[in-house]
Every structure is written in structure tokens, then in C-alpha cells.
Amino acid sequence: GEIFGEMATITHSPRSATATAKSTCRVIALDGSQFQKAIQQTPTFALMLMSIMIDRLRLTLARLTMQKALPDNVVTEERRVFDESTLDEIIAKLGNPALLRYNRGKSILKIGEAGVLMYLPREGRVTITADGRTLEHVGVGGVFGEMALVTRAPRAANAVAETDCALIAVNRTQLRQLVQSNPAFGLSLLKLVAQRLQAVTNRASK
């Protein structure tokens, strides 16, 4: 009932680990096209994979924090997940909600808080931090806060408005509806989580 090898398939990058059969086993193998088809046919599959990768990311971040080894600027480049037209489409599907506005320096999320929303910046830029370290910067087209929303676990990082910003807020029910109505949305979000996990793992190994 578990899964492995998904990282390379999602990010189209080389394998970063070795898998060895410790006993006689049978596995279901999916190539890239089959994997994409599975997500399109069963969008909630993307949420399940996201939950697995987020748990791995949380464990890695917790271990690095305990060891006082969490690197600064874990994600070195700002990742744009959605373009302008996709953001407009998301807003329309959400019923054109009012954007949440935060002034520069204002706290948006704090470690340990319940994760009832994830956010997509429509204007401005947000800084994500943990243990006094900057993990990444999220601008227009990016996403943050999805980890706690998907897994229903407490927030694992802080988020502060780096500039004045306007955010699209998405709750868990809306997230599921977006994934089910637009599999490409789920796949893009899944790829983002995979890239974050890959970035943390790569930086931790240096």
C-alpha cells in the first residue's frame, strides 16, 4: 500500500536513492505517462502522494532543526507554479473571493498553528522561515501553506509578508474541488512539493 520512486517521475530528475528488495515482493510499476494518466483519472491520488511527500519533508526539516543543521535559503530560486491566466481561473472557480491583504512585515503564518488555509500570492512576495533560517521566497504564481492543509498537521514554518501583498486563500474543501476539477492543478502542486523535498534533501546532504 506504499509507494517509492515517485520523486524522479514527478520532477523528471535522476534517481536520488537506491531501492533494494529485502524479501520476495510484487510491485505495480508506472512509467511517466501512466503516472500522469493515473492522476488525471483519480485526482485524489495527487493529494495522497502530496501527503506522503509532505510527511517526508516534515521529518527531514525536524531532523535538521534538532541538529541545528537547517541550511539558509533551502530553495534558492523562486518557483512559479501558476501563470497569470491560471491564477485568474482559480479565482473564478473559487467564486471571485476578496483577496487577503498584508502589509510588509506582517506575520501571515506561525509555526505550530493549525493549517486551515493555503495561499497563492496574487501580488507581492512572502518569506518562509523556520529556526531562524530563510527557507524560500514565494511570489506571484507560487504557493505556501499547503503542507499543513493537506496533512492537517500544525504549521512547520513561519510566513511573513516580504512586501505589501495580496493573497488568494484556499481551504481544504476548495483544494479538493480544484484538484478534482482540474487534474493539472493537482499535478502542478504535487511537483512543487516534490521539488521542495528534493531541495531540502540535496542541501542537507552537502
Predicted features and spans:
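Cytosolic regulatory regions built on CNB/CRP/Popeye-like sensor folds
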Residues: 2-206
